């Protein structure tokens, strides 16, 4: 590896860790999906299980510039979105239009009228690294 490239990588990693610390982010992050009460999301969550792979995709909307969808890879459906505060932090860290990896930690409320899901968010981008257009997301 070229010495300049090696130095660039080390500086990038240092700045990345510093930015994570400043934003209060420690990966993997644990959180829950929001906006899951609609019938489409409930149907998708009912079919989901712990360990299912997710993508967290930043899709700016008119009144929600930091909107981050929780997208199920096996189901090809949107399960919900992240809360606004966490979304803002992730947009600051990864920049607009990011797509990062995640997984379902567990599905909650299986014996109740409304199900939910807890998420584990990673700071990697490998599960769908070849996808750049997310306009096809079902439920977005």
How should each PLM-predicted stretch be described?
Residues 1-140:
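Conserved active-site motif detector
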């Amino acid at each position: 590896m070229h010495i300049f490239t090696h130095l660039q990588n080390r500086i990038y990693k240092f700045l990345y860790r510093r930015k994570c610390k400043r934003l209060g982010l420690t990966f993997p992050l644990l959180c829950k999906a929001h906006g899951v009460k609609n019938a489409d999301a409930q149907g998708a969550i009912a079919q989901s299980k712990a360990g299912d792979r997710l993508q967290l995709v930043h899709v700016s909307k008119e009144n929600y510039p930091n909107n981050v969808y929780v997208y199920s890879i096996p189901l090809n459906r949107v399960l919900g979105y992240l809360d606004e505060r966490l979304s803002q932090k992730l947009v600051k860290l990864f920049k607009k239009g990011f797509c990062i990896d995640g997984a379902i930690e567990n599905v909650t409320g299986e014996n109740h009228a409304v199900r939910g899901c807890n998420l584990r968010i990673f700071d990697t981008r490998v599960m769908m690294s070849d996808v750049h257009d997310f306009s096809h997301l079902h439920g977005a």
